[in-house]
Regions:
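Short alpha-helical transmembrane segments in multi-pass integral membrane proteins
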Residues: 1-17, 72-141, 177, 183-239, ...
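Transmembrane helix-bundle signature of multi-pass secondary active exporters and lipid flippases
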Residues: 15-70, 138-145, 232-300, 318-325, ...
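Short runs within selected transmembrane alpha-helices of multi-pass transporters and secretion channels
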Residues: 24, 65, 136-156, 164-175, ...
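Juxtamembrane/transmembrane-helix interface segments of polytopic membrane transporters
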Residues: 24, 28, 32, 36, ...
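Helix-loop interface residues and adjacent transmembrane-helix termini in multi-pass membrane transporters
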Residues: 38-41, 157-158, 186, 261-264, ...
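Small-residue-rich hydrophobic transmembrane alpha-helices
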Residues: 44-107, 148-157, 161-163, 267-327, ...
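ATP/adenylate-binding site constellation spanning eukaryotic-like Ser/Thr protein kinases
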Residues: 69, 114, 160, 170, ...
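Hydrophobic alpha-helix feature that most strongly marks membrane-spanning transmembrane helices
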Residues: 247, 251, 255, 264, ...
Length: 444
C-alpha cells in the first residue's frame, strides 16, 4: 500500500472514531451544562470530586477492553493460521466473561470503600453525602458500561468503526433526555448516575442484538468458558495499562486534593477546566485508537516497516485537534469556562488555571500517538514505568512550588500537569525510536 492510500484509509477510519468520541464529548458538555446551570457550583464540585474515583474504575474497563481487542486483532489478521476465526471467537467470548467477572468485583469494591475514597480526597462536608450516593449509583452502571466498551473496541479493530458510532449516538440522546427529565423532577446531582444506568443497559441490549449475527463477536455458549491462557494474555496486556491508569487516577486524586485546599471556589474552577481536559483527552484518544488499530494490523503481520509511515500520518492527522485545543485554551478561554457556570469568581480562577494547564493539553495528541504504538504492539509494561517517572516528577514540582516556594495552589497544579505530560511524551518517544530502529534492522 502506498502512502497516499494509507493516509486516505487512516483518514476515513479516524472520522468515525472522532465522531464517536465527539458524541461522548457532547454527553460530558451537556451533562455539565445541565448540572451547572440547573443545580449550581455545588453540583459541579460533586462531579469534580468523584471524577478521580470513577476514572480509576473506568480505566480498568478501558484497559481490558483494549487488551481484548488487541488480542482479537492479532489473531484475526494472522491469516497464516487456518484457525484464526475460531481462535478470535474464543478470545471474544472469554472477553465477555472477563468483563462480567471484573465488573462485579469493581462494583463490590465501590460499595465497600466509597467513604474511604472520599476521605482520601478531602471531600468537603457540604458535598460528602451527594458524592457518596453518586458513587454508589455509578457502581451499578459499571458492568454494562464495561461490556459495551468491550464490544465497541472489538468492532473497531475488526474494521467496523461505524457501528460503535451509532451505539454511542443513541446512548448520548437517551442519556441527556433522561438527565433533563430527572433534573426537572428534582432528583438533583444523582440524575447523572441514574441516567447513565438506564442508557448503558439499553445500549448494551441493542449491542447484543447486533453481535448475534457477527462472525467473531457473537456469543457462543460452547466457547463461553474460562480459558486460562486467554485470561493470562488479557491480563499480560491489560494489567500494565490498568496500573498505568491507576497511577494517572492517583495523580488526579492528588490534584483534586490540592485544589480542595483553596475551598469550593478553587475546586469548582478545577472542575470546569477538568471538563475540558476530559474533552481534549477523548479527542486525543481518537488518535490513539487509530494508532492501535493500524499498529495491531501491521506489527503482527511482519509488515513492520509500515509503522514509521503510520506514525507520520498520525502526526499529520493530529494537527487539526491541536489547533482546536490551542483556540479553546488560549483564545476563547473565557467563553469556554462560562459554558458551565456564570460565577465570576470561579471563572476568573478557571481561566488563569486553563492558560497554564492548556499547554499540556495541546501536547496530548502527539503523546497519544506514541501511546498507541506501545499498546498496539503489546509492549504495555513500559507505560507503567513511564507513568511512575512522570507522576513522581509532577508531585515534586507541585510540592516544590506550593509548599516550599508558596506559589498559588492552582499555579502549582498547572505547572505539575505540564511536567507530567512532557515526561511521558519524551520517554514514550525515546521508546518508540528504539523499537522502530530495531524493527527496521530486523527487516533489512
Amino acid at each position: 500500500m502506498n502512502n497516499k492510500n494509507l493516509f486516505k484509509e487512516m483518514f476515513f477510519t479516524l472520522i468515525p472514531l472522532i465522531l464517536t468520541n465527539s458524541l461522548g464529548i457532547l454527553k460530558y458538555i451537556t451533562n455539565a451544562f445541565l448540572v451547572g446551570n440547573f443545580l449550581g457550583g455545588k453540583a459541579i464540585s460533586v462531579l469534580s470530586n468523584t471524577f478521580p474515583i470513577t476514572l480509576i474504575f473506568y480505566a480498568i474497563s478501558i484497559a481490558f477492553s483494549t487488551s481484548i481487542s488487541v488480542l482479537i486483532s492479532k489473531t484475526f489478521y494472522n491469516t497464516e493460521n487456518e484457525n484464526n476465526i475460531i481462535n478470535s471467537k474464543k478470545i471474544a467470548n472469554n472477553g465477555y466473561m472477563f468483563a462480567l467477572i471484573t465488573g462485579i468485583i469493581v462494583s463490590f469494591i465501590i460499595f465497600i470503600f466509597d467513604n474511604l475514597f472520599l476521605d482520601i480526597l478531602n471531600t468537603p462536608n457540604e458535598i460528602l453525602y451527594d458524592s457518596r450516593i453518586f458513587l454508589l449509583l455509578f457502581a451499578v452502571s459499571f458492568t454494562p458500561n464495561f461490556l459495551q466498551k468491550n464490544i465497541n473496541e472489538s468492532l473497531r479493530v475488526l474494521n467496523k468503526p461505524n457501528i460503535p458510532l451509532i451505539f454511542v449516538g443513541i446512548n448520548v440522546i437517551l442519556n441527556n433526555l433522561l438527565l433533563y427529565v430527572l433534573i426537572l423532577n428534582d432528583f438533583g446531582i444523582i440524575s447523572i448516575a441514574i441516567a447513565n444506568i438506564f442508557s448503558d443497559i439499553l445500549i448494551l441490549l441493542a449491542s447484543y442484538v447486533y453481535i448475534r449475527s457477527h462472525e467473531v463477536l457473537k456469543i457462543d455458549f460452547s466457547l463461553f468458558k474460562i480459558d486460562r491462557k486467554i485470561f493470562k494474555d488479557i491480563s499480560n496486556i491489560g494489567l500494565p495499562i490498568v496500573f498505568e491508569q491507576i497511577i494517572v487516577s492517583l495523580i488526579i486524586f492528588f490534584e483534586t486534593s490540592i485544589s480542595n485546599l483553596g475551598g469550593i471556589i478553587c475546586n469548582s474552577a478545577f472542575g470546569i477546566v477538568g471538563r475540558w481536559e476530559e474533552i481534549f483527552f477523548v479527542f486525543s484518544q481518537s488518535i490513539q485508537s487509530l494508532m492501535i488499530i493500524y499498529i495491531c494490523r501491521y506489527y503482527f503481520t511482519k509488515d513492520k516497516t509500515m509503522i514509521f509511515r503510520i506514525t507520520i500520518n498520525g502526526i499529520i492527522l493530529s494537527i487539526l485537534p491541536i489547533v482546536l485545543f490551542i483556540s479553546i485554551a488560549f483564545i476563547f478561554t473565557d467563553f469556554a469556562c462560562k459554558i458551565f457556570l456564570k460565577n465570576e469568581d470561579i471563572i476568573s480562577i478557571a481561566v488563569k488555571y486553563f492558560h497554564i494547564a492548556g499547554i499540556a493539553y495541546c501536547i496530548m495528541p502527539i503523546d497519544m500517538i506514541f501511546n498507541g504504538f506501545i499498546i498496539g504492539s503489546a509492549k504495555t509494561k513500559f507505560l507503567f514505568i513511564t507513568n511512575i517517572i512522570a507522576s513522581i516528577s509532577e508531585i515534586i514540582i507541585v510540592v516544590l512550588l506550593y509548599k516550599i516556594l508558596n506559589y498559588d495552589n492552582m499555579l502549582a497544579l498547572g505547572c505539575g500537569i505540564i511536567t507530567y505530560t512532557l515526561f511521558t511524551l519524551l520517554l514514550n518517544y525515546i521508546y518508540y525510536l528504539k523499537n522502530v530502529f530495531t524493527i527496521c534492522k530486523i527487516e533489512k
